[in-house]
């Protein structure tokens, strides 16, 4: 039974292995190579993105909109393109009436300012003379019923006017200081902006070279991956082929075990058959002799009644099985002589070791390929190497730098003058704001003391110091108002004229695009101010188009008129470079000549088994004879019968004969029959195993030989298919590093290095500096100061009117007449000199 299991287990494993060893379609396993790592490229110096210049929010920002709306009412005329064109090209031919017509709103404001400048000081002078002669600004002549209402109304209007002056003065102070604080940084930002633009083209080659040098990053990463590519590819091949190779090797191992077990059984059958035949030849004569003697003895007259059972058994005492009828197996054994010559277990272990060492084998075979790949990898692609040298910017760089340098040099004196005059304006603004503050203080003190004096005075005709002091403070405020009215209106109009024209003529047209349209129209600018030429723009691109394209991130060579066109995509086309690497790697083939799966000795053993005819042996003939007893009768039972008969005999001679026959029969059974029975018992399992396994063994042997032969032809192609897929995966990953570099370079060049965004940013910064940081607070300053200046007039009127009520009222007779009653003087008698 144990021998049967020893053969059935290998056969079951062999059948399963043959089923699993059929070739399968192999899919690419790219995940085993790992993901593409993210390459970190060093930022190129000087390409750090600069945020656009923005103005910090200010609490009085809402005031800017009010000023702009006021200026839009003052200046209703559109942008004077023809007037500016004439002014720039031929200043002497500019007609005054055209200027006046365009500046009509400002002329009206100038007339108003002139009237203010003329009338207010003259009025102040007249009022001063009148006060000196005590004819103006005196007292209330009479007390009447509506006096309290008039006084309250005047004080209310004066207080409101003073509050308006106070608000305007605070806003004027704030805008004056804010304008001064913004002017310095704004003026300093102009040369900084021009200086940054000078390097817009000249610094590009140096930055491009820095970008080209970083091609070493993907080179280093790919070189690092190449160090382990052989082992990685070998692991992929091993993982893909093990589902094919391992079952075949397991089948070979199982078939070797089955072959060994079958030969052992066959040898046992052959040896046992020979012994059985020889033993039966020696057993037949003594059995026949015993039978004849027993029949003669038991058929005598004395044994008619008592010997029927023994006689029946003695009659059956003859050979049962005829072992000479069993077919010979020595011919099959002769064909299997020396089998198994190969050590299948050792062979399978060696093949397993060879297959498991596949990663090392591939690595060793790829050493020369990796060396060649690294040598080719160390070289830079032609396009990347010439990335900086091919940039055609020499002429444009010179023209651009000269234009910006000239503009910077010409602008410095004007910028210094702007700072100097701004300082003067700031000082004068502080002085005049202080004067307005003085007027406000005088008004507030006058109102406070005057009201206090009114409550403290019992009789309106009585003089009271607090009321008198209040009236004097109000008159002092009036004096200061007349005194500072002229410088106030002059400063307001001067700043209004400058700031208003900057806003309406420059900023408004800049925002609407009319300024760009004027600059781009041929003939509007003199030849020396041809911006398209000075900036080196392409002939078909205007300044406004350049601004819009640069704001969108267009590259320099698409906007500037460079020496030659610059094709970035052509320089970043590294397909030729990567194609050489791909071709070198894809041409690699793995040689698996050491992996045989079945060595020649094992193949000969299996072929010998296949042609041995093991399955053709008539095992049924063996079973027919094995199932028969060696002797038909039970010799032990017959011996007992004879011994019983011997005990029943009275005659000693017969008793002795029967006992002797029984003893000899037992002896024959033990010496001849029992060994034959043992041989039959030994032969039975071997025959049954061979009967059931020999056909399967032959089929599996044929299948295994066919599969091994087919795999020997298909395995190289399957291996190369796996290698090709794995190589594609490896190349895809490595090309990903070069793609990262190309993407980074394209983004770096187009968005940071060779982008003309600094040009549009400079224009936006210029608008921010001129209009938002300087013009807006400047205009807010004169607006607030003008507010205060014109509120001085109602302040003067209400202060003069109110001051009368703070002085004592003159007495008059009880009369309803409005005229003052003259006191009657009684004439005195005087002595006359004669």
Curated annotation (Swiss-Prot):
Cytoplasmic side: 128-153, 456-472, 801-834
Membrane topology: Multi-pass membrane protein
A GO BP annotation: negative regulation of pinocytosis
Induction line: Up-regulated by androgen.
Protein name: Prominin-2
Alphabetically ordered keywords of this record: Cell membrane, Cell projection, Cilium, Coiled coil, Glycoprotein, Membrane, Phosphoprotein, Signal, Transmembrane, Transmembrane helix
GO molecular function: cholesterol binding; growth factor activity; transmembrane signaling receptor activity
Main location class: membrane
Cell location: Apical cell membrane; Basolateral cell membrane; Cell projection, Microvillus membrane; Cell projection, Cilium membrane
UniProt note on tissues of expression: In the ventral prostate, expressed in glandular epithelial cells.
Entry's family note: Belongs to the prominin family.
Record's keyword annotation contains ATP-binding: no
Post-translational modification: Glycosylated.
InterPro entries: Prominin
Modification Phosphoserine occurs at: 818
GO CC terms, sorted: apical plasma membrane; basolateral plasma membrane; cell projection; cell surface; ciliary membrane; cilium; cytoplasmic vesicle; microspike
Coiled coil: 637-674
Quaternary data: Binds to cholesterol.
Extracellular-facing ranges: 28-106, 175-434, 494-779
UniProt signal peptide: 1-27
Sugar attachment sites: 270
């Amino acid at each position: 039974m144990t021998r049967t299991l020893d053969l059935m287990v290998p056969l079951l494993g062999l059948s399963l292995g043959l089923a699993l060893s059929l070739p399968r379609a192999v899919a690419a396993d790219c995940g085993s190579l790992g993901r593409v790592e993210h390459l970190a490229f060093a930022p190129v110096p000087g390409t750090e993105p600069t945020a656009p210049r923005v103005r910090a929010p200010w609490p009085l920002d809402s005031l800017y909109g009010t000023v702009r709306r006021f200026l839009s009412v003052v200046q209703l005329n559109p942008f004077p393109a023809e007037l500016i064109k004439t002014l720039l090209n031929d200043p002497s031919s500019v007609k005054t009436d055209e200027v006046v017509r365009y500046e009509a709103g400002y002329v009206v404001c100038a007339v108003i300012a002139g009237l203010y400048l003329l009338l207010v000081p003259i009025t102040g002078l007249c009022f001063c003379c009148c006060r000196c002669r005590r004819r103006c600004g005196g007292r209330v002549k009479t007390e009447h019923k509506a006096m309290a209402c008039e006084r309250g109304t005047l004080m209310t209007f004066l207080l409101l006017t003073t509050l308006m002056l106070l608000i305007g003065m605070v806003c004027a102070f704030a805008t004056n200081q804010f304008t001064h604080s913004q002017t310095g940084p704004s003026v300093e930002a102009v040369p900084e902006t021009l200086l940054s633009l000078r390097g817009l083209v000249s610094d590009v080659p140096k930055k491009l070279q820095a970008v080209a040098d970083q091609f070493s990053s993907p080179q280093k990463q790919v070189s690092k991956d190449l160090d382990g590519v052989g082992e990685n590819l070998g692991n992929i091949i091993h993982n893909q082929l093990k589902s094919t190779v391992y079952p075949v090797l397991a089948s070979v191992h199982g078939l070797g075990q089955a072959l060994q077990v079958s030969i052992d059984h066959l040898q046992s059958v052959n040896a046992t058959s020979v012994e059985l035949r020889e033993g039966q030849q020696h057993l037949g004569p003594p059995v026949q002799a015993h039978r004849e003697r027993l029949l003669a003895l038991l058929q005598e007259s004395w044994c008619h009644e008592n010997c029927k059972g023994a006689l029946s058994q003695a009659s059956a005492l003859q050979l049962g099985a005829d072992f000479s009828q069993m077919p010979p197996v020595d011919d099959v054994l002769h064909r299997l002589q020396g089998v198994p010559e190969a050590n299948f277990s050792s062979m399978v272990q060696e093949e397993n070791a060879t297959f498991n060492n596949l990663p090392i084998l591939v690595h060793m075979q790829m050493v020369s390929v990796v060396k060649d790949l690294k040598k080719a990898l160390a070289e830079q692609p032609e396009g990347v190497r010439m990335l900086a040298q091919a940039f055609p910017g020499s002429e444009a760089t010179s023209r651009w730098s000269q234009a910006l340098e000239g503009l910077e040099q010409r602008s410095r004196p004007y910028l210094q003058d702007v700072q100097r005059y701004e300082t003067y304006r700031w000082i004068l603004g502080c002085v005049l704001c202080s004067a307005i503050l003085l007027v406000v203080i005088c008004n507030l003190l006058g109102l406070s003391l005057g009201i206090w004096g009114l409550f403290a005075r019992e009789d309106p005709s009585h003089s009271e110091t607090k009321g008198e002091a209040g009236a004097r403070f109000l008159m002092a405020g009036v004096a200061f108002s007349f005194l500072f009215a002229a410088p106030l209106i002059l400063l307001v109009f001067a700043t209004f004229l400058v700031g208003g024209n900057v806003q309406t003529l420059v900023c408004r047209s800049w925002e609407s695009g009319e300024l760009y349209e004027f600059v781009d129209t041929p003939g509007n600018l003199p030849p020396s101010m041809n911006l398209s030429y000075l900036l080196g723009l392409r002939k078909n691109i205007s300044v406004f188009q350049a601004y819009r394209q640069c704001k969108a991130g267009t590259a320099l060579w698409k906007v500037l008129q460079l020496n030659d066109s610059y094709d970035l995509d052509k320089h970043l086309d590294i397909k030729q470079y990567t194609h050489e690497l791909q071709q070198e790697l894809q041409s690699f083939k793995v040689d698996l000549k050491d992996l045989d799966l079945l060595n020649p000795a094992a193949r000969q053993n299996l072929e010998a088994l296949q042609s041995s005819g093991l399955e053709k042996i008539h095992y049924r003939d063996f079973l027919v004879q094995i199932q028969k007893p060696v002797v038909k009768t039970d010799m032990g039972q017959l011996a007992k019968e004879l011994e019983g008969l011997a005990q029943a005999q009275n005659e000693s001679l017969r008793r002795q004969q029967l006992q002797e026959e029984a003893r000899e029969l037992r002896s024959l059974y033990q010496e001849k029959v029992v060994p034959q029975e043992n041989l039959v018992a030994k032969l039975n399992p071997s025959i049954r195993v061979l009967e059931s396994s020999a056909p399967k063994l032959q089929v599996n042997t044929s299948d295994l030989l066919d599969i091994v032969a087919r795999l020997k032809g298909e395995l190289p192609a399957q291996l190369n298919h796996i290698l090709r897929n794995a190589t594609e995966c490896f190349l895809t990953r490595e090309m990903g590093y070069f793609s990262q570099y190309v993407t980074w370079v394209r983004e770096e060049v187009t968005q940071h290095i060779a982008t003309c965004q600094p040009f549009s940013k400079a224009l936006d910064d210029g608008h921010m500096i001129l209009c938002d940081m300087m013009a807006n607070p400047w205009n807010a300053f004169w607006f607030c100061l003008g507010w205060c200046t014109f509120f001085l007039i109602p302040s003067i009127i209400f202060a003069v009117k109110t001051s009368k009520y703070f002085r004592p009222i003159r007495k008059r007779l009880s009369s309803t007449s409005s005229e003052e009653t003259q006191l009657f003087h009684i004439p005195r008698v005087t002595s006359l000199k004669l």
